[in-house]
């Protein structure tokens, strides 16, 4: 609600807003100027629920990715989103950039993990599709507009993410070949 109030005040006063997450993105999209309001989401760091039945985790957008990974692991579940900046990157930023990560070939991009979103539109309106449903054909899939939008359409404030059973075993392999296509073929066989 506070994000909504701040965004509405800025909208009413034609004030530019830059959203800050973990500041791990290196493309300069969070660079701010003296005439802009910087809205940090770092205190929106609550994990609301890890649901073992629906295999989902519901959280605020400022939660550090590694905290989500660990909370899932405590319930013997896997949040497959995992990349180098996991100890400081916030989940809202990962969603806003549609981050890939180390397990993208098996589990897909962040887009494939997001089941529901709550977001604040530029005029301060809160929209919510915080659903845990795997199959939902109840109209437009609003969350898809926000995933990868880099905050241009609104501020993501809460999320429902899909989890997987924690793998019982882990295999590592090394393949050396002169042909990149052979590497791809091998990796797809074992994923």
Where are these regions (language model features)?
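Glycine-rich N-terminal segment of FAD-binding domains in flavoprotein oxidoreductases
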Residues: 1-44, 59, 79
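A generic secondary-structure signal
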Residues: 9, 189-190
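Ser/Thr-glycine-rich phosphate-binding loops at phosphate-binding pockets of nucleotides
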Residues: 21-24, 64, 190-191
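FAD-binding subdomain of flavoenzyme oxidoreductases
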Residues: 46-50, 56-189
């Amino acid at each position: 609600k506070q994000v909504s109030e701040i965004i509405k005040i800025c909208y009413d006063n034609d004030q530019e807003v830059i959203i800050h997450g973990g500041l791990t993105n290196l493309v300069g999209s969070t660079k701010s100027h003296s005439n802009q309001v910087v809205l940090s989401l770092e205190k929106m760091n609550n994990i609301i629920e890890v649901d073992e039945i629906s295999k989902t985790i519901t959280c605020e957008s400022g939660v550090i990715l590694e905290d989500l990974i660990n909370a899932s692991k405590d319930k013997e579940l896997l949040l497959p989103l995992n990349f180098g900046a996991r100890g400081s990157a916030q989940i809202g930023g990962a969603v806003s950039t549609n981050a890939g990560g180390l397990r993208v070939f098996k589990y897909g991009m962040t887009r494939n993990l997001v089941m529901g979103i709550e977001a604040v539109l530029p005029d301060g309106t809160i929209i919510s599709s915080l659903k845990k449903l795997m199959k939902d054909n109840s109209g437009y899939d609003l969350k898809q507009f926000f995933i990868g939008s880099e905050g241009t359409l609104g501020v993501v404030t809460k999320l429902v993410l899909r989890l997987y059973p924690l793998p019982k075993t882990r295999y590592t392999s090394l393949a050396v070949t002169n042909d990149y296509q052979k590497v791809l073929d091998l990796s797809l066989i074992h994923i």
